[in-house]
Amino acid sequence: IMKAAVVKGNSKVEIENFTISDVGSNELLIKMQSCGICGSDVEKVFGKYGQPSMRLGHEPAGEVIKIGDAISDFKIGDRVFTHHHVACYSKDCHECSHGNETMCKQYYQSNLNPCGLADNYVVPEWNVLHGGVLKLPDNVSYQEAALIEPLACCVRAWSKFKYQKNDTVAI
């Protein structure tokens, strides 16, 4: 049984129990050590988010505590950051081929179970096999690793700017 933070109404968060039967052959079970609280999490709690999942936390880092039979790239005890969703990145995918990976259908089918803000969570096969789990160097703390996804959002936004030398920008 795992415990996870779940939105249960307007401005109400509860801890809910989840049962995961086992880890699939290409899945990982992670003990969460740190998890960021994103603007979308805050919106789920206090706003009108309107998404089907009201589970919280998608910026987690933790320790591998169980591995599927077919996994050889990770071992128990590895310190990792896990992406909450992973797009297909196919040139045949309209969204991915136009730089809109967060709109990819596969992206929405690849979430952590039950969520990142849980004592333990399962990383699905798609994420494991498509680069959604990163081993952490020893000099990166779990707290720093929980900032990987927000930093990636900033880098992505910056890369979309069409700025030139001598332009004025607001930060």
Listing of model-derived features with the role each one plays in the protein:
Residues A4, G62, C154-A157:
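Small residues (Ala/Gly/Ser/Thr
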Residues K8, T19-I20, Q51-H58, Q109-P114, ...:
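Short Gly/Pro-enriched turn/cap motifs at secondary-structure boundaries
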Residues S21-C35, K48-H94, L134-P137:
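Glycine-rich beta-strand-centered segment in the early N-terminal region that forms part
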Residues K3, E27-L29, T168:
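Residues that mark the start of a beta-strand
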Residues Y89-V169:
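NAD(P)H dinucleotide-binding glycine-rich loop of Rossmann-like/cofactor-binding domains
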Residues V6-V13:
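Extracellular beta-rich ligand/substrate-recognition surface
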Residues S40-V45:
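Cytochrome P450 core scaffold surrounding the K-helix E-X-X-R motif
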Residues E14, G24, G116-L117:
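A generic structural signal for well-ordered coil/turn residues at beta-strand boundaries
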